[in-house]
Amino acid sequence: MAHKKAGGSTKNGRDSESKRLGVKRFGGESVLAGNILVRQRGTKFHAGANVGIGKDHTLFATSEGKVSFDVKGSKNRKFVSVITD
């Protein structure tokens, strides 16, 4: 009887799609109003001058200028700002 025993099933073998989070425009880069600066979960980066925050905590430029990253305050929070020319 040259039969093969049936292979068992597995509970593994799936994964979620990557969400493409992270910094999209780096320090010193020129941006236009509406450009996305950072995609994040929660406020790893906080909104500084000329930067808005979306309902999913995405940071975006509200005016034209250059991107600046700063660490401020006693809690060493990271702020993203857009410096207008």
UniProtKB/Swiss-Prot annotation:
Keywords associated with the record: Ribonucleoprotein, Ribosomal protein
Family the UniProt entry places it in: Belongs to the bacterial ribosomal protein bL27 family.
Native source organism of the sequence: Idiomarina loihiensis (strain ATCC BAA-735 / DSM 15497 / L2-TR)
Name assigned to this protein: Large ribosomal subunit protein bL27
Region (Disordered): 1-22
Gene Ontology molecular function, alphabetical: structural constituent of ribosome
Cross-referenced PROSITE patterns: RIBOSOMAL_L27
Record has Electron transport as a keyword: no
Gene Ontology CC terms: cytosolic large ribosomal subunit
InterPro entries in the record: Ribosomal_bL27, Ribosomal_bL27_CS
One GO biological process term: translation
SUPFAM superfamilies xref list: Ribosomal L27 protein-like
Domain of life of the native organism: Bacteria
